Amino acid sequence: MLEVKTVDKPDERRDFPRGHLDALHLTGLDFAVGTFEPGWRWSESVAPIAGTESCMVHHNGYVVQGRMHLRMDDGGEVEVGPGDVFVCPPGHDAWVVGDEQVVVYDFAGGMAQGYAKAAGA
């Protein structure tokens, strides 16, 4: 079966401090668009919602705009920007770099399914 949806009309939206997530759910694909404002940091904006010390969601991402810094719990770090495709396993923090909004497309599914949802929700 063919399915088409537009990011302009997501199935759900989750707001959190300094950002929001739009999720689209299709057969075999849960797709997310994350929008993060300057000053956003996962450990400050989403950790209180998730109830974990670091982000435990796996990401397969594409950066549309802005720059984001990722720091793994094991100390590994990277900065991603427009046009970058990245894989980030669970166990990390992240934050916006600079004063430009960050927009990330995430194809891994976990972000669309459970990101910024309270544990057990």
What are these regions (language model features)?
Residues 1-35, 43, 119-121:
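A short, N-terminal "cap"/entry segment at the start of jelly-roll beta-barrel domains
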Residues 3-9, 95-121:
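Double-stranded beta-helix
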Residues 33-54:
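Conserved short histidine dyad/triad with adjacent acidic residue
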Residues 34-36, 61, 86:
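Conserved GNAT-family N-acetyltransferase fold
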Residues 41-42, 66-71, 94:
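Short beta-strand segments in beta-sandwich/barrel cores
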Residues 48-74:
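Glycine- and acidic-residue-biased ligand/ion/polar-headgroup-sensing regions
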Residues 64-65, 90, 98:
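A cytosolic small-molecule/anion-sensing beta-strand core signal
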Residues 72-92:
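Short acidic-glycine-tyrosine-enriched beta hairpin
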